[in-house]
């Protein structure tokens, strides 16, 4: 009961006195045995089980490594961002190309007032409209603390091309999501994608992907399994399935340098490739450099330079394909 009795037997209580709560009453003529030699011990608290973290989404498994690789640039691009309020922003994009068609895009973004974190607010509405009449739109909303939904649609010259509905549920130590793409009840076609990712330990997460597609005269299912191990300075991810294998390794050398290795094997194309990418961040110089090289002897690099106090960002990129003897370069300017 947490109480320690004195070494000497206590004097018997006077007759008729009520028993002291919390103590066992002693019958008349009996004495308590001596308890000398017992030392008080502090109450021991049972160790609490460490809760496993949420592993994120299945689509984020390879993202850390993918973000290190430069994005191919070609031609000249001008982007102008303008914030009209704390919730609404528009942007204009002009792209001039010597290979493809030059185009103009107008985009708008609305962020709602449902604040869930320092950088998260819902609902989010994103739209992009180009000079040919094509439209890309997304609506993202946090329905509850655990459920997030997204609707995306794409039109091309006033005709619906793609649309999909995503629903994601985040538990304490797992994430499950379902995506329905281009469903057509009359024709009997559509794509269904299911993802599940579970934290096994604080460092290890395992999951799987199921893709079911159906259209007239064709029906099939593709499955794949994924595993990700996260350490303080590196992350290794492996995805195995009927379509092939995909493995990435991300390593953070220091605050300025990050490295990534990617391996891809396609069972349908009977082809494999290995890529090495790195990112060098120099905050004092407002400089960000990304470079990559792969087994097909394609070398690429991009350089981004911010020009404070002006709201300007310069971007330059170049890619060289040694096998095909092709070279592409691009230049971009972002205002705002």
Curated annotation (Swiss-Prot):
InterPro entries: Porin_dom_sf, Porin_Euk/Tom40, Tom40. GO terms for biological process: monoatomic ion transport; protein import into mitochondrial matrix; protein targeting to mitochondrion. It is found in: Mitochondrion outer membrane. Keywords: Ion transport, Membrane, Mitochondrion, Mitochondrion outer membrane, Porin, Protein transport, Transmembrane, Transmembrane beta strand, Transport. It comes from the Eukaryota. Signal peptide: none annotated. The keyword Transmembrane applies. Residues 42-52 have a biased composition (Basic and acidic residues). Residues 1-58 are annotated as: Disordered. GO terms for cellular component: mitochondrial outer membrane translocase complex; pore complex. One of its GO terms (molecular function) is porin activity. It holds the Pfam family Porin_3. Residues 10-21 have a biased composition (Pro residues). It is a multi-pass membrane protein. Forms part of the preprotein translocase complex of the outer mitochondrial membrane (TOM complex). Interacts with mitochondrial targeting sequences. Belongs to the Tom40 family. Channel-forming protein essential for import of protein precursors into mitochondria. This is Mitochondrial import receptor subunit TOM40 homolog. It comes from Xenopus laevis.
């Amino acid at each position: 009961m947490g109480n320690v009795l004195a070494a000497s037997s206590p004097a018997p209580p006077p007759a008729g006195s009520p028993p002291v709560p919390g103590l066992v009453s002693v019958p008349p003529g009996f004495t308590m045995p001596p308890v000398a030699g017992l030392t008080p011990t502090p109450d021991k608290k049972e160790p609490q089980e460490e809760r496993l973290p949420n592993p994120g989404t299945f689509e984020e498994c390879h993202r850390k490594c993918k973000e290190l690789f430069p994005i191919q640039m070609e031609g000249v691009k001008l982007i102008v961002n303008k914030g009209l309020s704390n919730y609404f922003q528009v942007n204009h994009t002009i792209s001039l190309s010597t290979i493809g068609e030059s185009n103009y895009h107008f985009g708008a973004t609305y962020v709602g007032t449902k604040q869930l974190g320092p950088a998260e607010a819902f609902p989010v509405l994103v739209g992009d409209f180009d000079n040919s009449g094509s439209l890309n739109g997304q609506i993202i909303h946090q329905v509850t603390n655990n459920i997030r939904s997204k609707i995306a649609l794409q039109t091309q010259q006033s005709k619906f091309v793609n649309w999909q509905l995503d629903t994601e549920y985040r538990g304490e130590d797992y994430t499950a999501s379902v995506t329905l793409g281009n469903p057509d009840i009359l024709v009997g076609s559509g794509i269904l994608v299911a993802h599940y990712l579970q934290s096994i330990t604080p460092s290890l997460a395992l999951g799987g992907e199921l893709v079911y597609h159906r259209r007239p005269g064709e029906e099939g299912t593709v499955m794949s399994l994924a595993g990700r191990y996260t350490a303080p300075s590196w992350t290794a991810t492996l995805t195995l399935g009927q379509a092939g294998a995909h493995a990435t390794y991300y390593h953070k050398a220091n605050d300025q340098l990050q490295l990534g290795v990617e391996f891809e094997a396609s069972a349908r194309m009977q082809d494999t490739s290995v890529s090495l990418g790195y990112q060098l961040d120099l905050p004092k110089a407002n400089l960000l450099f990304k470079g990559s090289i792969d087994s097909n002897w394609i070398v690429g690099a991009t350089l981004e330079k911010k020009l404070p106090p002006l709201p300007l960002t310069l971007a330059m990129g170049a890619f060289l394909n040694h096998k095909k003897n092709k070279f592409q370069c691009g230049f971009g300017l972002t205002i705002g």
